[in-house]
């Protein structure tokens, strides 16, 4: 009896920390190669790979899908899988770089992956925190699909609902938002130097970085070639201090 009790106590000691520690599940999607020849982008697949690499410094639960593998079916299946795996208190992080349209992102097979469908999966999950980064044209339209919930919802969007999102293939992250995001998560956004990056720190860094690059790009350009891009944050103020990265 004593032997059984000792074994049980040891088992509980091993199990308890696993159940108590919140986990972060990451889905990183990037599409540069679309069906046909007219829709291809520059380095969105690399955007997803680089984001996945950065997130692997925070968690080992990272799934990356790029280009031809990023069909609508595969994207939703992968998202459903991590939403199902996530338990109470866990966090889901989704990154997307590629084409966007009103109310959706666009898969490799040129199908609409609707924001409302992704939101349904997020809300059905037991996860407490939902953090998304969308580097896509018209990504600001997702705001209308954010429902009232007790979950901590945080969306970083590359542009307003009526704006295009810019890219530059000479960068490590081609998308303007992605470039700023990667630098910010690596510590550039840590304004108080406490080795943690919070939601509001990261957004302020991204917004300033992107708008400065847009201003530089527009300098000297004719009016018909000037562009606009203003990153957006969809988030309750109570989540501004949520820690997204630490080292």
What are these regions (language model features)?
Residues 5-6, 13, 17-247:
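Cysteine endopeptidase catalytic domains of the caspase/legumain-like
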């Amino acid at each position: 009896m004593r032997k059984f009790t000792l074994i049980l106590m040891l088992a509980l000691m091993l199990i308890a920390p696993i159940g108590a520690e919140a986990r972060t599940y990451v889905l990183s999607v990037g599409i540069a190669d679309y069906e046909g020849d007219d829709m291809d982008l520059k380095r969105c697949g690399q955007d997803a790979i680089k984001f996945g690499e950065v997130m692997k410094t925070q968690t080992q639960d990272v799934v990356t899908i790029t280009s031809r593998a990023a069909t609508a079916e595969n994207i939703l299946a992968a998202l459903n899988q991590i939403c199902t795996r996530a338990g109470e208190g866990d966090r889901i992080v989704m990154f997307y770089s590629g084409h966007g349209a009103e109310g959706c992102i666009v898969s490799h097979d040129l199908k609409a992956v609707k924001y409302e469908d992704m939101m349904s999966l997020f809300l059905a999950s037991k996860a407490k925190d939902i953090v998304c980064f969308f580097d896509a044209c018209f990504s600001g339209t997702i705001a209308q699909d954010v429902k009232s919930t007790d979950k901590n919802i945080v969306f970083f969007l590359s542009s307003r609902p009526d704006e295009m999102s810019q890219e530059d293939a000479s960068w490590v992250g081609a998308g303007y938002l992605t470039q700023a995001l990667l630098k910010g998560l690596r510590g550039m956004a840590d304004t108080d130097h406490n080795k943690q990056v919070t939601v509001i720190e990261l957004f302020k860094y991204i917004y300033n970085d992107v708008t400065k690059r847009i201003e530089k790009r527009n300098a000297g350009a004719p009016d018909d070639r000037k562009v606009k891009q203003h990153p957006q944050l969809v988030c309750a103020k109570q989540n501004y201090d949520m820690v997204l990265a630490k080292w």
